[in-house]
């Protein structure tokens, strides 16, 4: 059992690591912004639209949620101002107090709620429908999945009324996993602690109370289902993972899984299908590893990514680079991996920093990372949120992924372990 002293020591280490990270930020990043939210957000996702502000800035939007103590929770659509590619980056503009770099000043770096929607309980996860980004699904501490059209809500709620567009019924417990079908509008999957995956078509007729029963309920896991994801290229295929340490691959037309794999040595918390390759997917686990799989031969994992120091709760592929994958979790770190570097020769000194496929470690958080999202419009830009209310928008220095600058001092770009 952890003692108070252990916690204090852990906090001290985290604080020291953060100071080192902050000192090296101008050398490791082209862009960093740190913002303290009013309440922690367990979920984050960039919306796909971008608006032009002026010659040097564009306005992006984020889907966030709140996790309050006893106050009203909200689903948030927030806007953020970001410098354009042709904005002049100046190292002298780095703000050590705010840990901001890359053109963000005290005004430009604000994250401001644009629309605030009443939500029943904290927002465990929120994701927009790819075909209509104004339609957002959320998971909460309650069993139902909620659907909102944020265009039908004012900037600030008029009262405390909770008014989702649709309530999706079918689960008996809460959960986190949520996935919209990228190829068929309106189809959505949800994973739950009740050991099932539910499937709905939100275009189907709902009852007078605005409720819609699940089209299908998939039962194959023997414990909590942690995550679910549609295949990106095959519209009827999806995967699920759970606390039974298994990866299940399903066809939506069949009630039993086509594949059932013992994927990890501990609970499997997340999965993601590669958007470029129809055969490749990744899973993240409490065993501190990310596993790479080929659907053509699931008997053996292709590779195990090992560098995290604690449970992994989120894994996502870059929308711009086929070989780039990121993972995050309890160790307060977000790791960016490059599959093309697997098996490359390393010096003993480099090996101490991690395997060759470990491209970058984002060390800006001092608490568990709850969620992160790749920006769909700006390559290499990531937004990550942690349990201590912190939201960070960041982009690693281009010499790290372009390998242009061989002269950068090793002590400066040393990965934060």
From Swiss-Prot:
Key words of the record: Centromere, Chromatin regulator, Chromosome, Developmental protein, Nucleus, Repeat, Repressor, Transcription, Transcription regulation, WD repeat
Compartments, record wording: Nucleus; Chromosome, Centromere
A Pfam family that the UniProt record links to this protein: WD40
GO process terms (BP): cell fate specification; chromatin organization; chromatin remodeling; embryo development ending in birth or egg hatching; embryonic digestive tract morphogenesis; mitochondrial unfolded protein response; negative regulation of DNA-templated transcription; negative regulation of vulval development
Keyword Repressor: yes
CC annotations in GO: chromosome, centromeric region; DRM complex; ESC/E(Z) complex; nucleus; NuRD complex; transcription repressor complex
Disruption phenotype: Decreased protein levels of DRM complex components including lin-9, lin-37, lin-52 and lin-54. Double knockout with the programmed cell death regulator mcd-1 results slow larval growth. RNAi-mediated knockdown results in embryonic lethality. RNAi-mediated knockdown leads to a reduction of hcp-3 and his-1 protein levels and to a depletion of hcp-3 on centromeres and a reduction of H3K27me3 levels on metaphase chromosomes. RNAi-mediated knockdown results in chromosome segregation defects during mitosis.
Principal localisation: nucleus
Any GO MF annotation of the entry: histone deacetylase binding
Domain of life of the organism encoding this protein: Eukaryota
PANTHER family the UniProt entry points to: WD40 REPEAT FAMILY (PTHR22850)
Name assigned to this protein: Probable histone-binding protein lin-53
Source organism of this protein record: Caenorhabditis elegans
């Amino acid at each position: 059992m952890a003692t108070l002293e252990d916690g204090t020591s852990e906090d001290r280490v985290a604080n020291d690591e953060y100071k080192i990270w902050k000192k090296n930020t101008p050398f490791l990043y082209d862009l960093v912004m740190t913002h303290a939210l009013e309440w922690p957000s367990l979920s984050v996702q960039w919306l796909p639209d971008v608006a032009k502000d002026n010659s040097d800035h564009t306005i992006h939007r984020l889907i966030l949620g709140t996790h309050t103590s006893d106050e009203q929770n909200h689903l948030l659509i927030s806007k953020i101002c970001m410098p354009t590619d042709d904005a002049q980056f100046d190292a002298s503009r780095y703000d050590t107090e705010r840990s901001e770099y890359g053109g963000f000043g005290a005004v430009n770096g604000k994250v401001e709620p644009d629309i605030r929607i009443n939500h029943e309980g904290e927002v465990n996860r929120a994701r927009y429908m790819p075909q209509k980004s104004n339609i957002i699904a959320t998971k909460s501490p309650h069993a139902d999945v909620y659907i909102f059209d944020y265009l039908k809500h004012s900037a600030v709620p008029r009262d405390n009324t909770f008014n989702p567009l649709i309530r999706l019924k079918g689960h008996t417990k809460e959960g986190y996993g949520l996935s919209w079908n990228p190829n068929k509008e309106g189809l959505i999957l949800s994973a739950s602690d009740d050991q099932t995956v539910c499937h709905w078509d939100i275009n189907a007729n709902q009852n007078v109370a605005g409720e819609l029963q699940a089209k299908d309920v998939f039962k194959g896991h023997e414990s909590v289902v942690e995550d679910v994801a549609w295949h990106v290229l095959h519209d009827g295929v999806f995967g699920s993972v759970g606390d039974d340490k298994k990866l299940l691959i399903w066809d939506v037309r069949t009630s039993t899984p086509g594949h059932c794999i013992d994927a990890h040595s501990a609970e499997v918390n997340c999965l993601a299908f590669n958007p470029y390759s129809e055969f490749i997917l990744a899973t993240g686990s409490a065993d501190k590893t990310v596993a790479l799989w080929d659907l053509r031969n699931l008997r053996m994992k292709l590779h195990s990514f090992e560098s995290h120091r604690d449970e992994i709760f989120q894994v996502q592929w870059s929308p711009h680079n086929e070989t780039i994958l990121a993972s995050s979790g309890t160790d307060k770190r977000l790791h960016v991996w490059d599959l093309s570097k697997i098996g490359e020769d390393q010096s003993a000194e480099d090996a101490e920093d991690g395997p060759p496929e470990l491209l970058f470690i984002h060390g800006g958080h001092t608490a568990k990372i709850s969620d992160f999202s790749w920006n769909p419009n700006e390559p290499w830009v990531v937004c990550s949120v942690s349990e201590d209310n912190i939201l960070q928008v960041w982009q690693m220095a281009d010499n790290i992924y372009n390998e242009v600058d061989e002269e950068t001092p090793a002590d400066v770009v040393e990965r934060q372990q």
